[in-house]
C-alpha cells in the first residue's frame, strides 16, 4: 500500500491497545493524516503514557510532517527552512555531519536536533516489538461510506487541544521600539489613493511597499508572478505575496514632537496626574501648552520641582534667572518628569508616609501608591505613556471604497491619520525654517489634539468632526458599545448555513421533528448534497454542481438522504433562556413556512400569528452529536428555572382533553328547560350499563348507545392492570372519554379518574368502585361526578409521568396528548357566537343601587361632612365592590355547557375578568398619570360602549403598550448584566468538602402568609448535617445526602420549621461551585454534572420572566402614605444593583432593648440600649410608622420602621448570611407576587457573585494596599503566602457590590472590557500588565477558544480525564 494512501486510513487499523486508540479519537485523530494538525509537544501531552506506543507509527510514517510541528525553537526552524528542509522526511535523510555544517557548529541548536534524532531513532521500531509494517494488511470494505465511518467514531466527549492555542492573554504598554518592530515601514505623507490611477500613493496611508500588494502576487509593475513568491520587486519595491497581508501589516508615523496618550491623561482617574502627583487640570494645561512645569528648579531660585507656571510667569522668570532653571511645556515636560521618576524610591517613600498620615491624606497616598506599584511590579516604563511614534493599523482594517462618479467612501480613521500627518509634516517644516516659538508651540498643541482624536475622539474637549454634528469614529469607538468590536464581532457573530421563515403549526409532527421547506433545505444542505452526489453517483465535482443546479431527481433523493439523522437548530428571537434554541430532526415539507410542533411553542414563547424563526445547521459530527444528545426538543421537557414541565398543552389541546374527560350524570337538572332535560336523558339513557371490555364500550359509542361522557361500569382489569387487589374484585365507574385518555398514559401508571394529586401518585380512589352484588343504579347516586381535566391538571400529569418514566416515555405521551386534544376539540365542535354571551340579569338594579349610594355620598360632601379625598375614596370603593359582586354573580349564572365558559374553565383561553367585561361592566379606568378615574365604564362589550366610555378606555390601552415596550428593554438589559456577572460560574468539582451550610425556612410576607414553602427550598438540595425528626428522632437524611421528593415531604410533615442545607453561599471551590452545594440540575432532574454552566442558567432564569414583572412603583395609602414601595422590575434592579432603596427602613445597629419612643415635632425618636448599656438614637421621618414598641428586645439588623432595608447597611451591622438571605427573600417575594416560580439556587448564584470581594482594612505583611477591594481568592492567596513566612495576616471585611460594579471588577479584564467602560478597563489593565487567565466563558468566546464548560472543561488544567482500561469506549455504543 502506497504511503499517501495509507495516510487517509483510520487509526482503527493500527495495532494499538484500546486505551491508545480511545485517546487518539478523543483528541480528534481519526485518520493518520490528522497527526499533522498537532505539534509534537501537544501529542505528548494528549497521549501521555500512550505516546511511546504510538511513537513507532510516527517514526515509520515521518509524522508530524512539517518541521514547524516538531516543537523546535523558531531559530532552528528558520535555519532548516533556509537550507530547504521543510518536512521531517527531508530532515531524516541528512546525516549528523551535514547538519553540523548547516548549523555552523552552534552547540545549543545542535542539541535540539540531536534530541529529536534520539526520539525518532529507527531502532525503536524493532525494540518496541512492533512489526515494521505498522498497519494490518486489511483493506476497508468498499461499501462502507465515508459518512458511516465518520458516524461510527462520533465523539460525544472530545479533548480539542488544537482550538485553544494559548493559556492566558496579557496586555501592556508598548515601547517605541516595539511599535517600530511591528511596522513594515514609515508613513510619511497623508496621500491615500491616486484618483486617476486608483492605485495607492507611495509613502501614503495605503502604500503597497509598506502594507503589501493590493492584488495577490502582483506588484505595481503589472504581471502576476507566483514564481517570485516572497521576493521584493527591484523596480517598485513591493513584496510579491498574497494581498491578505494588508489585513495584518502595520506601519508607523515618527512624530516630530512627543505626545501624551489621551487614555492615561483624560480617563478618569487620570493615571498620569496620580503618578506625578499633580492635579489633572494643571497637567492638562501643561500638555496642551497653556502652562509650563518646572523640571529642574536650579540653584538660588524660588522655584520647586513640578511647580506650574503660567506663560506670563515663565517669561518674567526667564528674564530674571535666565538659564539657571528649566521649565518645559507640552508632552516633552511630562516625558522628562516620568523619566526622572525613581519608582523604588517612590514606593518606599509613600509606604513610610502611609503609616503617619491622616485619613484624608491616606486616601490620596493609597491612590498614588496603587499606580506607582502597578508600574513598579510590571514590565512597563512610565515614559511609554508619552509617544514619539504611533502605529498605523493595516489598511484593510480601514478601507477606502470607490463610489460612482470617481469619489471614495472612507473610514473615519483615515481622516484622523491624515490630520496627524498634515500637522506632523507642517511641524517638521516649521522646525527646518526655524519658525518662532509661538507658532511651533501651537502646531505641537494641534498635533497633540490630532493624536488624541485618533485614540479617543469621544472624550471631553474639542472633537474632530466631519460635519458640525458628527464626530469621527476613533480607535476607542471601534471597541466600545454595542456596535464595537467586542460586542458586535467577538461575542456574537453572524453564521453561514442558516435560514429564516415564518412558522406555522405542525400538528402531525413528532416531538423531536420540525418541518423544513424543501427549497430552504436544498440550499442549507448544499455541501452535504454535493458530497452525496459524488459518493453515490460517482459524479465529478463539476457534474455534481450541474446536477445540483438542475435540481433533478437525484438531487432531491440526495437531500432526503442527507437530512436523515441530521438535526437542525431552531431559534426564535429574543432568546431569553437556553430553551430559545432547540434541536429538531428535519421532516421535508412543501410550501415556504417552517412547521413547528405545537407543544414546544411555550419554550420559545412563540405563537403562529406571523412569528419568524431562524434555522441553523450544525456541521461537524461533534456539533451534530451535541445537538442530538443535549438539545433535542424531546429532551428539553423541564424548565431550568423551576424544574416544572415547560411543554404544557395549550388552547385546542387543553380544550379537547377537557371535553373528552367531562363526566355527566343522567339526573342532571336543567330547571324549566324540559326540552334540554329530555335530550340529556336520551343521550345518557344507558348510564350505569355493564361492559366487559373496552372494545365493547367503543362499539356502544359507535352505535350511539352511549356518549363520551356517559357514566358506565366496567371490569377494572379490562382497562388497566394498576388497580389494587380489592379494586380488581369490584366494578369501576368511569366514562369512555376517560378510558380513551388513560390509553395514552404508560402501562404502569395509575388509572386517572379524577383530577387530584392522590389519584396520580397513589391509586384510583375507592369511591369510584361498586362492590359486586350491589344495585348499580342506587350506587351511582352516591358516586360523585368528578371535574373534567383542566390545563393545570394536565401539567401535573406530565410532571408525574416525567418523574416515574423519564424523558423518552414522557415525550411519547406528550405527542399522544397533543393528538388526543386536537382530535376531540374537533369532535366537540366547540364554537363561540354572539348568542353565547348574555348580559348579566341583575346588573341594571345593582348599578342603579350604587348610583343612589354615590348621590348620598356627594350630599355628605356638599354638607362638609367629608373631605374631597375621602369622598373620592368612598366613590371608588363603591364602584369596585359592585364590579366584584357582578363578577361573582356572572360565574354562578353561567351554564357549564356554555362554550365560552368551557374555554375559560378548561384553561384554554380567557379568564373571569374577560367575562366581567364581556357581559358585566368594564369598571373603573386609570388616567395617563395612573390615577383611577371616578366615573366607571358601566357598559359591557356585549352592550357596547358610549363615546365618553370609549375615550376613557383608551388611556389604559396606550399606557399598556408603552409600558410593554419600556419593560422589554429594561428586562433585556437586566438579563445582560446578570449574565455578565455570573458567566464564569461553572460546576468545577463534585464536592468542595465544605462543612458549613445555611438554615432555610419558608419565606413569608408581612402578614405571615407563606410565599415560598419550605419544601420548595429544600427539594433537590444536599443536607449540611444529619436531619433528624424533632418528634421521633428518626434520621430523615444523612449529611451530604440528597433531599428527594419523599424526604422533603416527610421533613415538612414532621413540622420542622428550619433545615440546614448545603448552599452555594458557603461553597469553598475556587473558580466555580461544587455539585453538592448546587444540588440537582432542574432541567434534567438529575445530579448536576461537572462542567455545567450554572451561572448563565441562573442569569437566564431570573432575566427571562423579567418581562412579566410590572414597571410600577406603588403608592401606598393609610399610615405609611409617604413611603413609595417599589415593586416589580424596578425592585429587582434595586436589589441586584445593591442600591439605596426608595422608602428606606431604619435598622438597629446593635442587639439590645427599646428604651424609649418619643415624638418631637412630628418625627419619631427611638432610643435603644445595647447589652453594655450604651444608648443609640434613631430618628424616623414624620410619616413613617415605627415597627417596635417600648421595652421590646431587638437584634442587630432588625427593622425599626416600615420600608425596605439597604442590604449594604445590613451587611455592615450583621453578617454575609443575613444580608444574602434578605436579598434572596426579597427577590422571591417580587417574583412570587407575579406568580413566577424561580428556584433559590439561581438567585444564590447571583448573590454569591455580588459578595466575591473584600475591602482590606489592615494590610499586615501582604502586598495588598489598605482600603482596596480584592477578590476573596486573591485575599486568601496573599494570606497563605504570608502564613508560610509566619508574617502578619491581612484583615478585611466583605463588601456587597451591585451586579454592574461586580462585572466591572471581574478578575478577567477581557470580560469586564466587553461589558461596559471599555477604555477605562483596558487603560488600567495595560498599566498593570494584567494577565487574563481565561477562566470564564466570555473571555474564551472572545479569543475564539473552546469555552470551559461541558466537554470543553476536560481540557482545563485542573481536570484529569482518564478512561478505564476495561470499559468499552463511549462511541462504540453511540447510535
UniProtKB/Swiss-Prot annotation:
Keywords: DNA-directed RNA polymerase, Magnesium, Metal-binding, Nucleotidyltransferase, Transcription, Transferase, Zinc. InterPro entries: DNA-dir_RpoC_beta_prime (IPR045867), DNA-dir_RpoC_beta_prime_bact (IPR012754), RNA_pol_asu (IPR000722), RNA_pol_N (IPR006592), RNA_pol_Rpb1_1 (IPR007080), RNA_pol_Rpb1_3 (IPR007066), RNA_pol_Rpb1_3_sf (IPR042102), RNA_pol_Rpb1_4 (IPR007083). Transmembrane segments: none annotated. GO terms for cellular component: DNA-directed RNA polymerase complex. Residues 1-158 are annotated as: Unknown. Zn(2+) binds at residues 219, 221, 233, 236. Binds 1 Mg(2+) ion per subunit. Binds 1 Zn(2+) ion per subunit; 2 are expected compared to other organisms. Mg(2+) binds at residues 607, 609, 611. It is an enzyme of class 2 (transferase). Its EC number is 2.7.7.6. Residues 159-1353 are annotated as: DNA-directed RNA polymerase subunit beta'. GO terms for biological process: DNA-templated transcription. One of its GO terms (molecular function) is magnesium ion binding. The keyword Transcription applies. It catalyses: RNA(n) + a ribonucleoside 5'-triphosphate = RNA(n+1) + diphosphate. Its cofactor is Mg(2+); Zn(2+). DNA-dependent RNA polymerase catalyzes the transcription of DNA into RNA using the four ribonucleoside triphosphates as substrates. Belongs to the RNA polymerase beta' chain family. This is DNA-directed RNA polymerase subunit beta'.
